[in-house]
Regions:
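A short glycine-rich, Lys/Arg-flanked "PGG" loop and its adjoining helix->strand segment in the class I
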Residues: 245-257
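Extended basic-aromatic, gly/pro-enriched interface segments that bind polyanionic ligands
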Residues: 126, 147-231, 235-246, 268-270, ...
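Conserved class I S-adenosyl-L-methionine
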Residues: 118-131, 157
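Conserved AdoMet
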Residues: 2-122, 264
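Conserved SAM-binding loop of SAM-dependent methyltransferases across substrates and taxa
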Residues: 130-149
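Class I S-adenosyl-L-methionine
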Residues: 267-288
């Protein structure tokens, strides 16, 4: 109980954050990245920023806020989002999605494109983190299309707000335990040994992934053509409902008729949304 007095929270390194300072940073993070930091995340924010602030010789969170807002290059904002965002993932996470992609969604899209005499297979991984999701999808596309893959304008656009995550994704090298969830035949075919305890995605797969830094809070998505499938899994859990609703609206505008939106199994678009048709948990389809 605070009796109406401003509160401060001290981190293990001695830095303290006041109500006003936390509100300033929380509002900035929400405004720029859509991430909704609740009061329960206050100690997390303090803990993750302490080392960075010491390295910058900043003694208060007000000084850090001024540093952020004065940086016109926005590099400091990139550092901030790297620290507050979570990049925990692994290959074949939420396997049901990949099974549906390979067995149902991809065949349906390929059949429709052939009927329309098109060869442009457009898939976007929004919030791709360290690259496991787009690489898994590419392997499945190559498996499904076989030798015919080279005749398609395929590949995957993979975007994230974190430069640190994108750097790992572009390298395509992972600890072996992160890869073990994949079926053995995919590991054997699409990976090579990397160091004493690592595996690297082969170049044939890596060159089919286009990794870009992109902020999902952009008011307008700059894509010239819509996508047949959008994967945005375990991203919207960090957003409040108005932010989610606005993002889903932009996703819908960027989805082809009949296209799919995959979200995380802990997420839902809610019963009130009418843009997409519900297919199964965490999977939606745009009307034809």
């Amino acid at each position: 109980m605070n009796n109406g007095k401003p509160q401060t929270l001290a981190g293990s390194g001695g830095l303290t954050i006041s109500d006003r300072e936390f509100t300033q940073l929380r509002d900035l993070i929400h405004r720029r990245f859509g991430i909704n930091l609740t009061d329960q995340k206050r100690s997390l924010l303090v803990g993750r920023l302490q080392k960075l602030m010491r390295n910058l010789n900043l003694s208060t969170f007000s000084d850090y806020y001024e540093y952020l807002t004065a940086d016109k290059t926005e590099a400091s904002l990139g550092e901030l989002v790297d620290l507050v965002s979570t990049n925990h993932t692994y290959f074949n996470r939420e396997k049901d999605h990949f099974d549906y992609f390979y067995q149902t969604a991809l065949p349906a899209v390929i059949t429709r494109l052939k009927q329309e005499r098109r060869k442009d297979l457009r898939i976007w991984c929004a919030g791709c983190s360290t690259g496991e999701e787009p690489y898994t999808l590419l392997m499945l596309m190559m498996e499904y299309l076989g030798k015919d893959y080279v005749n398609w304008d395929a590949g995957i656009l993979a975007t994230d707000i974190s430069d640190r995550a994108l750097s790992i994704a572009r390298r395509g090298a992972y600890p072996t335990d992160r890869v073990m969830q994949l079926p053995e035949h995919l590991r054997r075919k699409y990976f090579a040994a990397a160091g004493a305890d690592g595996m690297a995605v082969i170049d044939q797969v890596k060159r089919e992934a286009t990794f870009r830094r992109f902020n999902l809070m952009n008011a307008v998505f700059p894509f010239k053509k819509p996508f047949q499938m959008i994967f945005c899994r375990n991203v919207m859990i960090y957003f409040d409902q108005p932010t989610r609703d606005a993002l889903v609206q932009r996703f819908h505008q960027s989805t082809e008729a009949g296209g799919y939106l995959f979200i995380g199994h802990s997420e839902t678009l809610g019963r009130s949304q009418t843009l997409y048709r519900y297919v199964k948990p965490a999977l939606y389809q745009k009307g034809a």
